[in-house]
Regions:
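Short N-terminal or domain-adjacent regulatory/targeting segments
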Residues: 1-27
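Phosphate-binding glycine-rich loops and adjacent basic patches that engage nucleotide phosphates
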Residues: 7-11, 62-70, 92-100
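Redox- and metal-dependent alpha/beta enzyme cores, enriched for Fe-S-associated oxidoreductases
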Residues: 21-75
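Short, surface-exposed connector motifs at secondary-structure boundaries
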Residues: 29-32, 85, 112-114
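Short acidic, S/G/P-rich loop/turn micro-motifs used as interaction or catalytic elements
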Residues: 39-43, 65-67, 86-94, 122-125
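Alpha-helix C-terminal capping/helix-to-coil transition sites in glycosyltransferase folds
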Residues: 77-79
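Extended, charge-rich low-complexity interaction segments
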Residues: 82-105
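Ser/Thr/Gly-rich flexible loops in soluble cytosolic domains mediating phosphotransfer, phosphorylation
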Residues: 101-145
Length: 145
């Protein structure tokens, strides 16, 4: 009688442990981070898990139409958000003025929270790794204040 082997559970290789001292995210605690961009539902779940684990609030807008109709000017001079983490999004959004995109306006106009882009291979792309890197950058900026 042949013995059947139990399948080993799948462990994704692309997940980097968030355990080294740089990525403790302790300066995010109690803060609200705005996530804007095309974000897959599995990554939204990951962001929510990070928020719960590291005690920060994640305000996520990932729907293309909602981003297009979101007036980015509402983020100006608002102390609601500690930072904005941006992924790929439509160029044309409400309130972008003469800028080529809402993201350009957020990065260049005074009075907006820090904007950190989720970048993979020099392109805006939301992945677990780019989320972790963006949160590390936000954590560092908050620590430096």
């Amino acid at each position: 009688k042949e013995k059947k082997l139990k399948p080993t559970p799948y462990i994704p290789q692309d997940i980097e442990p968030v355990s080294d001292s740089d990525s403790e995210f302790k300066y995010l605690e109690g803060k609200t981070i705005k996530f804007l961009g095309n974000i897959k539902s599995s990554l939204i779940a990951y962001i929510k898990w990070l928020a719960k684990t590291y005690n920060f609030e994640a305000d996520i807008t990932s729907d293309y139409d909602k981003i297009t109709n979101l007036d980015f000017r509402k983020f100006r001079y608002s102390d609601k958000y500690a930072a904005i983490i941006a992924g790929p999004m439509p160029h044309s959004v409400k309130g972008k003025g003469d800028y080529s995109s809402g993201l350009e306006m957020l990065k260049n106009e005074p009075g907006y929270p820090d904007v950190v882009e989720c970048v993979t291979s020099e392109k805006l792309k939301v992945t677990r790794t780019s989320i972790n890197k963006a949160l590390q950058e936000v954590n560092y900026k908050l620590m430096s204040r």
